[in-house]
Regions:
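Conserved beta-strand positions
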Residues: 31, 63, 97, 135-138, ...
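N-terminal binding-site loop/beta-alpha segment at the start of enzyme catalytic domains
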Residues: 1-93
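N-terminal small/glycine-rich loop or linker at the start of catalytic domains
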Residues: 20-38, 96-109, 132, 137
Length: 332
């Protein structure tokens, strides 16, 4: 059956923010395919989530070469959806991918060399059935490769027509400042920085990253807005057997201390008092920062996506509520 997107996908369902000083607008909520879209996940479920997102005004889909599992399979899933459903709407989509983390064996399978970045993007384009991506990121800073080499590769990728814009991900403030300067001199200014930012991890506010983005006219997109599920009702009563902490990986059991549980429970009560879920309040908190261009969410189901998108219909946090959140973080 042929897919036809919702006719009112650009109604008041979604608001869009300017990305730095560029001509690009990003949806306040974007969809990331880090988890739940790999080869181990049912294809029909992945397709349903992506099409629901587009039907509701999400135009930005964020990937990376090694998203899955297995590596590359999230791009393959997305490429299949592009080919079968979304190809007629390619010009309405803003697609990003990244390279820099472990992807293939040998000395050229990761980090920031020119060889790795070009090879990885060529592979990504093939997996996604695309001629170009809208944003290509250096996924992490490589301290062993000259920054000039990495930035020149990004610039040349744009000049080769393989990407329209470039971005950097998880770069420390001082290195990001140098990267912005090189890219500007190359006449391919940095469009966006992607960084971890949420109520429990406020470092971009304090380490200069957010203010640096604003000063340099660079957008900022926040990943891990729910702190890998900690900022939800998932861990209020312990560690569920099917949770990310129970499965291992990035989140460790020692992350969930008694203090952390107390903070999460207090935040959850504040969210209840506001008439929303903790996840919705966490997204709302991020959108309250004018330097945040977009919040990058994941989705394990259409229902979860629907609930998180409903945040856009919620009133913003008041100054008093923001202070209550800070009090919770510092008083427990």
């Amino acid at each position: 059956m042929q897919y036809y997107p919702s006719e009112d996908r650009y109604s008041d369902k979604m608001k869009y923010r300017r990305c730095g000083k560029s001509g690009i607008l990003l949806p306040e909520i974007s969809l990331g395919l880090w988890h739940n879209f790999g080869g181990v996940d049912p294809y029909e479920g992945s397709k349903a989530k992506i099409l629901y997102a587009f039907d509701n005004g999400i135009t930005h889909f964020d990937l990376a070469n090694n998203y899955g599992p297995p590596y590359g399979s999230a791009e393959e899933t997305f490429g299949r959806i592009i080919k079968n459903e979304l190809y007629p709407y390619r010009d309405e989509l803003l697609i990003s991918t990244k390279a820099g983390h472990d992807m293939w064996k040998g000395p050229y399978g990761e980090w920031g060399s020119r060889k790795h970045l070009f090879a990885s993007l060529n592979q990504s384009l093939q997996r996604m059935n695309l001629e170009y991506v809208d944003i290509f990121y250096s996924h992490r800073y490589d301290p062993d490769t000259p920054l000039e080499e990495t930035m020149q590769a990004l610039s040349d990728i744009v000049k080769a027509g393989k990407a329209l814009y470039v971005g950097i991900s998880k770069y420390p403030y001082d290195v990001a400042e140098k990267a912005y300067k090189i890219l500007k001199e190359n006449k391919t200014p940095c469009l966006i920085l992607q960084g971890r930012f949420n109520i429990l991890e406020e470092s971009p506010l304090n380490n200069g990253v957010l203010s640096g983005c604003e000063k340099n006219g660079v957008g900022f997109i926040a990943f891990s807005p729910l702190a890998q599920g900690l900022l939800s009702d998932r861990y209020l009563n312990g560690i569920p057997n099917d949770s990310r902490i129970a499965r291992g990986g990035y989140l460790k059991k020692e992350t969930l201390t008694e203090k952390q549980i107390s903070i999460i429970k207090s935040l959850n009560q504040l969210a209840i008092d506001r008439g929303e879920s903790l996840a919705q309040m966490a997204i709302n908190w991020l959108l309250g920062h004018h330097s945040v261009t977009s919040v990058l969410i994941g989705a394990s189901s259409v229902e979860q996506l629907k609930i998180n998108l409903a945040t856009l219909n919620r009133p913003p946090l008041s100054d008093q509520e923001k202070q209550l959140i800070q009090n919770i973080l510092t008083s427990i």
